[in-house]
Amino acid sequence: MIIADNIKQFHSIRNSLIKQQKIGFVPTMGALHNGHISLIKKAKSENDVVIVSIFVNPTQFNNPNDYQTYPNQLQQDIQILASLDVDVLFNPSEKDIYPDGNLLRIEPKLEIANILEGKSRPGHFSGTLTVVLKLLQITKPNNLYLGEKDYQQVMLIKQLVKDFFINTKIIVCPTQRQPSGLPLSSRNKNLTSTDIEIANKIYEILRQDDFSNLEELTNKINSTGAKLQYIQKLNNRIFLAFYIGKVRLIDNFLKETGPSC
Protein backbone atom coordinates (compact mmCIF):
# COMPACT_ATOMS: atom_id res chain seq x y z
CA MET A 1 0.00 0.00 0.00
CA ILE A 2 1.26 3.44 -0.95
CA ILE A 3 0.75 6.21 1.62
CA ALA A 4 0.48 9.81 0.42
CA ASP A 5 0.70 12.33 3.26
CA ASN A 6 0.17 15.41 1.12
CA ILE A 7 -1.44 16.49 -2.15
CA LYS A 8 1.84 16.71 -4.09
CA GLN A 9 2.66 13.09 -3.27
CA PHE A 10 -0.86 12.01 -4.13
CA HIS A 11 -0.85 13.80 -7.49
CA SER A 12 2.37 12.01 -8.40
CA ILE A 13 0.74 8.66 -7.57
CA ARG A 14 -2.53 9.55 -9.29
CA ASN A 15 -0.74 10.64 -12.48
CA SER A 16 1.12 7.33 -12.65
CA LEU A 17 -2.09 5.32 -12.92
CA ILE A 18 -3.10 3.95 -16.30
CA LYS A 19 -6.01 5.92 -17.73
CA GLN A 20 -8.03 2.78 -18.39
CA GLN A 21 -7.86 1.72 -14.74
CA LYS A 22 -11.13 2.10 -12.84
CA ILE A 23 -10.64 3.92 -9.55
CA GLY A 24 -12.79 3.49 -6.44
CA PHE A 25 -12.64 6.00 -3.59
CA VAL A 26 -13.69 5.56 0.05
CA PRO A 27 -13.46 8.78 2.09
CA THR A 28 -13.17 8.31 5.86
CA MET A 29 -12.23 10.18 9.00
CA GLY A 30 -10.31 7.19 10.32
CA ALA A 31 -11.07 5.08 13.41
CA LEU A 32 -12.01 2.38 10.93
CA HIS A 33 -14.60 -0.28 11.75
CA ASN A 34 -16.49 -3.02 9.91
CA GLY A 35 -18.74 -0.45 8.25
CA HIS A 36 -15.73 1.11 6.55
CA ILE A 37 -14.35 -2.34 5.79
CA SER A 38 -17.57 -3.31 3.98
CA LEU A 39 -17.25 -0.20 1.79
CA ILE A 40 -13.62 -0.99 1.00
CA LYS A 41 -14.39 -4.61 0.13
CA LYS A 42 -17.17 -3.46 -2.18
CA ALA A 43 -14.77 -1.01 -3.83
CA LYS A 44 -12.12 -3.73 -4.19
CA SER A 45 -14.60 -5.98 -5.98
CA GLU A 46 -15.56 -3.32 -8.53
CA ASN A 47 -12.38 -1.35 -9.32
CA ASP A 48 -8.80 -1.78 -10.46
CA VAL A 49 -7.44 0.69 -7.90
CA VAL A 50 -8.88 1.58 -4.48
CA ILE A 51 -8.04 4.84 -2.73
CA VAL A 52 -8.99 5.45 0.90
CA SER A 53 -8.64 8.85 2.52
CA ILE A 54 -8.30 9.57 6.23
CA PHE A 55 -8.98 13.19 7.10
CA VAL A 56 -10.81 14.45 10.17
CA ASN A 57 -12.39 17.51 8.64
CA PRO A 58 -12.56 20.36 11.19
CA THR A 59 -15.08 22.45 9.23
CA GLN A 60 -17.91 19.94 9.62
CA PHE A 61 -17.80 19.97 13.42
CA ASN A 62 -20.04 22.59 14.98
CA ASN A 63 -18.98 21.37 18.44
CA PRO A 64 -15.23 21.87 19.12
CA ASN A 65 -15.29 19.19 21.82
CA ASP A 66 -16.66 16.65 19.33
CA TYR A 67 -13.74 17.42 17.01
CA GLN A 68 -11.16 17.20 19.78
CA THR A 69 -12.47 13.88 21.09
CA TYR A 70 -12.99 12.23 17.70
CA PRO A 71 -11.16 8.86 17.84
CA ASN A 72 -7.68 8.77 16.32
CA GLN A 73 -5.96 5.43 15.66
CA LEU A 74 -3.89 6.06 12.54
CA GLN A 75 -1.36 3.26 12.96
CA GLN A 76 -4.12 0.72 13.56
CA ASP A 77 -6.01 2.09 10.55
CA ILE A 78 -2.92 1.70 8.36
CA GLN A 79 -2.65 -1.96 9.40
CA ILE A 80 -6.33 -2.53 8.60
CA LEU A 81 -6.01 -0.91 5.17
CA ALA A 82 -2.85 -2.87 4.36
CA SER A 83 -4.58 -6.13 5.33
CA LEU A 84 -7.41 -5.26 2.92
CA ASP A 85 -4.89 -4.70 0.12
CA VAL A 86 -5.89 -1.07 -0.37
CA ASP A 87 -3.76 0.48 -3.10
CA VAL A 88 -3.41 4.07 -1.85
CA LEU A 89 -4.00 5.77 1.49
CA PHE A 90 -4.39 9.54 1.17
CA ASN A 91 -3.75 11.06 4.59
CA PRO A 92 -3.56 14.85 4.12
CA SER A 93 -3.12 17.51 6.78
CA GLU A 94 -5.51 20.37 7.45
CA LYS A 95 -2.99 22.69 5.77
CA ASP A 96 -3.15 20.55 2.62
CA ILE A 97 -6.93 20.69 2.38
CA TYR A 98 -7.32 24.29 3.55
CA PRO A 99 -4.02 25.97 2.50
CA ASP A 100 -5.45 29.48 2.85
CA GLY A 101 -8.00 28.68 5.52
CA ASN A 102 -11.66 27.98 4.95
CA LEU A 103 -12.24 30.92 2.57
CA LEU A 104 -14.62 29.30 0.08
CA ARG A 105 -17.46 27.02 1.18
CA ILE A 106 -20.39 25.16 -0.29
CA GLU A 107 -23.58 26.53 1.28
CA PRO A 108 -26.45 24.14 0.43
CA LYS A 109 -29.84 25.78 0.00
CA LEU A 110 -31.85 22.58 -0.42
CA GLU A 111 -34.67 21.95 2.04
CA ILE A 112 -33.11 18.64 3.06
CA ALA A 113 -29.99 20.51 4.21
CA ASN A 114 -31.96 22.48 6.80
CA ILE A 115 -33.70 19.66 8.68
CA LEU A 116 -32.51 16.81 10.90
CA GLU A 117 -28.70 17.03 11.00
CA GLY A 118 -28.73 20.37 9.18
CA LYS A 119 -30.93 21.90 11.86
CA SER A 120 -29.15 20.24 14.78
CA ARG A 121 -25.61 20.97 13.58
CA PRO A 122 -25.46 24.38 11.88
CA GLY A 123 -22.68 24.51 9.29
CA HIS A 124 -22.16 20.75 9.32
CA PHE A 125 -23.27 20.09 5.76
CA SER A 126 -21.43 23.14 4.46
CA GLY A 127 -18.20 21.73 5.85
CA THR A 128 -18.97 18.21 4.67
CA LEU A 129 -19.86 19.16 1.10
CA THR A 130 -16.86 21.49 0.84
CA VAL A 131 -14.39 18.80 1.85
CA VAL A 132 -16.06 16.14 -0.33
CA LEU A 133 -15.79 18.45 -3.34
CA LYS A 134 -12.10 19.01 -2.58
CA LEU A 135 -11.43 15.29 -2.16
CA LEU A 136 -13.22 14.43 -5.40
CA GLN A 137 -11.24 17.09 -7.27
CA ILE A 138 -8.01 15.63 -5.89
CA THR A 139 -8.73 11.92 -6.30
CA LYS A 140 -10.87 12.02 -9.49
CA PRO A 141 -12.43 8.58 -8.92
CA ASN A 142 -14.77 6.67 -11.18
CA ASN A 143 -16.74 5.41 -8.18
CA LEU A 144 -17.39 6.91 -4.75
CA TYR A 145 -18.50 4.59 -1.92
CA LEU A 146 -20.71 5.92 0.88
CA GLY A 147 -22.61 4.33 3.75
CA GLU A 148 -26.39 4.46 4.06
CA LYS A 149 -26.04 5.37 7.76
CA ASP A 150 -25.40 8.98 6.69
CA TYR A 151 -28.42 8.95 4.38
CA GLN A 152 -29.12 12.69 4.53
CA GLN A 153 -25.49 13.43 3.75
CA VAL A 154 -25.56 10.97 0.85
CA MET A 155 -28.55 12.77 -0.70
CA LEU A 156 -26.67 16.07 -0.55
CA ILE A 157 -23.49 14.59 -2.00
CA LYS A 158 -25.53 13.19 -4.90
CA GLN A 159 -26.80 16.71 -5.56
CA LEU A 160 -23.26 18.08 -5.29
CA VAL A 161 -21.96 15.62 -7.88
CA LYS A 162 -24.86 16.43 -10.20
CA ASP A 163 -24.69 20.23 -9.88
CA PHE A 164 -20.91 20.43 -10.32
CA PHE A 165 -20.83 17.98 -13.26
CA ILE A 166 -18.47 15.60 -11.49
CA ASN A 167 -17.95 12.43 -13.50
CA THR A 168 -18.14 10.07 -10.53
CA LYS A 169 -20.72 7.39 -9.80
CA ILE A 170 -21.99 7.16 -6.22
CA ILE A 171 -22.46 3.69 -4.76
CA VAL A 172 -24.43 3.58 -1.50
CA CYS A 173 -23.85 0.56 0.72
CA PRO A 174 -26.11 -0.78 3.52
CA THR A 175 -25.58 0.25 7.13
CA GLN A 176 -23.54 -2.28 9.09
CA ARG A 177 -24.95 -2.99 12.55
CA GLN A 178 -24.12 -4.77 15.76
CA PRO A 179 -26.40 -7.70 16.70
CA SER A 180 -28.42 -5.31 18.89
CA GLY A 181 -29.15 -3.12 15.86
CA LEU A 182 -26.81 -0.28 16.87
CA PRO A 183 -25.13 1.02 13.70
CA LEU A 184 -21.36 0.81 13.55
CA SER A 185 -19.77 4.21 14.06
CA SER A 186 -16.31 5.49 14.92
CA ARG A 187 -17.92 7.32 17.84
CA ASN A 188 -18.96 3.98 19.35
CA LYS A 189 -15.36 3.71 20.54
CA ASN A 190 -16.14 6.46 23.06
CA LEU A 191 -19.02 4.52 24.63
CA THR A 192 -18.50 2.99 28.06
CA SER A 193 -19.88 -0.44 28.95
CA THR A 194 -22.80 1.31 30.68
CA ASP A 195 -23.39 3.42 27.57
CA ILE A 196 -23.51 0.28 25.43
CA GLU A 197 -26.14 -1.22 27.74
CA ILE A 198 -28.24 1.92 27.24
CA ALA A 199 -27.75 1.72 23.46
CA ASN A 200 -28.87 -1.91 23.47
CA LYS A 201 -32.04 -0.94 25.37
CA ILE A 202 -32.77 1.80 22.82
CA TYR A 203 -32.51 -0.63 19.91
CA GLU A 204 -34.66 -3.19 21.68
CA ILE A 205 -37.32 -0.46 21.95
CA LEU A 206 -36.87 0.52 18.29
CA ARG A 207 -37.14 -3.06 17.05
CA GLN A 208 -40.47 -3.49 18.87
CA ASP A 209 -42.04 -0.15 17.89
CA ASP A 210 -44.31 0.54 14.91
CA PHE A 211 -43.44 4.28 14.86
CA SER A 212 -47.09 5.35 14.99
CA ASN A 213 -46.61 7.53 18.09
CA LEU A 214 -43.26 9.31 18.06
CA GLU A 215 -44.00 11.27 21.25
CA GLU A 216 -44.50 8.05 23.18
CA LEU A 217 -41.40 6.58 21.55
CA THR A 218 -39.40 9.65 22.57
CA ASN A 219 -40.39 9.13 26.20
CA LYS A 220 -39.41 5.46 26.03
CA ILE A 221 -35.97 6.27 24.60
CA ASN A 222 -35.34 9.04 27.14
CA SER A 223 -36.31 6.67 29.96
CA THR A 224 -33.23 4.56 29.17
CA GLY A 225 -30.91 7.37 30.28
CA ALA A 226 -30.25 8.59 26.75
CA LYS A 227 -31.29 12.02 25.51
CA LEU A 228 -33.14 11.97 22.20
CA GLN A 229 -32.34 15.01 20.08
CA TYR A 230 -34.78 14.23 17.28
CA ILE A 231 -36.80 11.45 15.74
CA GLN A 232 -38.67 12.09 12.51
CA LYS A 233 -40.40 10.25 9.69
CA LEU A 234 -39.32 11.37 6.24
CA ASN A 235 -40.91 9.55 3.32
CA ASN A 236 -40.53 5.89 4.26
CA ARG A 237 -37.60 6.36 6.63
CA ILE A 238 -37.13 6.99 10.33
CA PHE A 239 -34.30 9.38 11.26
CA LEU A 240 -33.04 9.88 14.79
CA ALA A 241 -30.18 11.37 16.78
CA PHE A 242 -29.51 10.88 20.47
CA TYR A 243 -26.89 11.40 23.14
CA ILE A 244 -25.64 8.71 25.46
CA GLY A 245 -23.54 10.64 27.93
CA LYS A 246 -21.42 12.96 25.80
CA VAL A 247 -21.49 10.71 22.72
CA ARG A 248 -23.87 11.71 19.94
CA LEU A 249 -25.13 8.97 17.62
CA ILE A 250 -27.34 9.08 14.53
CA ASP A 251 -29.26 6.47 12.60
CA ASN A 252 -31.87 6.00 9.91
CA PHE A 253 -33.70 2.99 8.59
CA LEU A 254 -36.73 2.00 6.58
CA LYS A 255 -39.89 2.16 8.66
CA GLU A 256 -41.00 -1.27 7.43
CA THR A 257 -37.82 -3.10 8.42
CA GLY A 258 -36.67 -1.16 11.47
CA PRO A 259 -33.01 -1.26 12.52
CA SER A 260 -32.46 -4.85 11.41
CA CYS A 261 -29.00 -6.28 10.92
Swiss-Prot record:
ATP binds at residues 29-36, 147-150, 184-187. GO terms for biological process: pantothenate biosynthetic process. One of its GO terms (cellular component) is cytosol. Beta-alanine binds at Q60. Its EC number is 6.3.2.1. Keywords: ATP-binding, Cytoplasm, Ligase, Nucleotide-binding, Pantothenate biosynthesis. One of its GO terms (molecular function) is pantoate-beta-alanine ligase activity. SUPFAM superfamilies: Nucleotidylyl transferase. (R)-pantoate binds at Q60, Q153. It is found in: Cytoplasm. It catalyses: (R)-pantoate + beta-alanine + ATP = (R)-pantothenate + AMP + diphosphate + H(+). Pathway: Cofactor biosynthesis; (R)-pantothenate biosynthesis; (R)-pantothenate from (R)-pantoate and beta-alanine: step 1/1. The active site is at H36 (proton donor). The reaction proceeds by a bi uni uni bi ping pong mechanism. NCBIfam families: cyt_tran_rel, panC. Homodimer. Catalyzes the condensation of pantoate with beta-alanine in an ATP-dependent reaction via a pantoyl-adenylate intermediate. Belongs to the pantothenate synthetase family. This is Pantothenate synthetase. The lineage of its organism: Bacteria, Pseudomonadati, Pseudomonadota, Gammaproteobacteria, Thiotrichales.
